[in-house]
């Protein structure tokens, strides 16, 4: 049975503010930086997020496996009692060169080129199309849920909502065909 095209209400939540200080001090790079926990401000943001009325309308809570998203999701799970699923494929957008400078340059190129990767690009990164495919393939297993809270990352969320800037712990509701 072909099940493509089922609409699921996704309540996107960007993770709280992370604290990279300890990892940067120890020269962590790439996915090593994804071990960063929330900052004190990020924890306050996550606690405030738990008061959002939309969260209680969901059937399931899904989180990226990145520490900052998972820590944010832990607050939501405790406050709402929603079952939590962790998805490693809902990670942050990938830039294939190390360093914050390269990340910011890649982000500028990504935005300038509407998510495409030009053949002569000086930095390699995951395209918008690749991110969408990764997301949809990962989320296919949740088609039987009407409403899912998804704690994830700005660049991934931006592929489905028009906001260019998505604040920490911002809640954005949308229907997505999965």
Q: Regions from the language model: what does each represent?
A:
Residues 14, 88-90, 175-178:
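Residues at the C-termini of beta-strands that transition into short coil/loop
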Residues 70, 133-178:
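Active-site-adjacent alpha-helix immediately C-terminal to a catalytic or transition-state-stabilizing loop
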Residues 21-26, 73, 96-100, 162-164:
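Short aromatic-enriched loop/helix-cap "lid" or pocket-rim segments at secondary-structure transitions
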Residues 63-67, 89, 151-155:
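Short, well-ordered beta-to-alpha junction loops that form the rim of enzyme active sites
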Residues 9-85, 172:
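Active-site-proximal alpha-helix that buttresses catalytic centers in soluble enzyme cores
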Residues 22-23, 32-37, 78-134:
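Phosphate-handling substructures
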Residues 1-7:
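Short, Lys/Arg-enriched N-terminal segments with co-localized hydrophobic residues
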């Amino acid at each position: 049975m072909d099940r493509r095209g089922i609409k699921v209400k996704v309540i996107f939540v960007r993770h709280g503010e992370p604290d990279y200080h300890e990892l940067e001090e120890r020269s962590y790079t790439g996915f090593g930086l994804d071990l960063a926990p929330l900052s004190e401000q990020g924890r306050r943001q996550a606690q405030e997020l738990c008061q959002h009325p939309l969260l209680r309308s969901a059937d399931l809570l899904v989180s990226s496996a990145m520490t900052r998203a998972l820590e944010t999701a832990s607050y939501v799970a405790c406050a709402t009692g929603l079952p939590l699923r962790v998805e490693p494929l809902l990670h942050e957008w990938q830039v294939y060169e190390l360093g914050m400078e390269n990340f910011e340059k890649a982000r500028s190129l990504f935005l300038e080129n509407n998510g495409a990767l030009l053949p002569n690009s000086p930095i390699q990164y995951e395209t918008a199309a690749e991110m969408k495919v990764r997301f949809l393939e990962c989320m296919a297993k949740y088609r039987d849920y009407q409403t899912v809270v998804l704690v994830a990352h700005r660049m991934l969320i931006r592929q489905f909502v028009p906001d260019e800037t998505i604040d920490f712990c911002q809640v954005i509701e949308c229907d997505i065909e999965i």
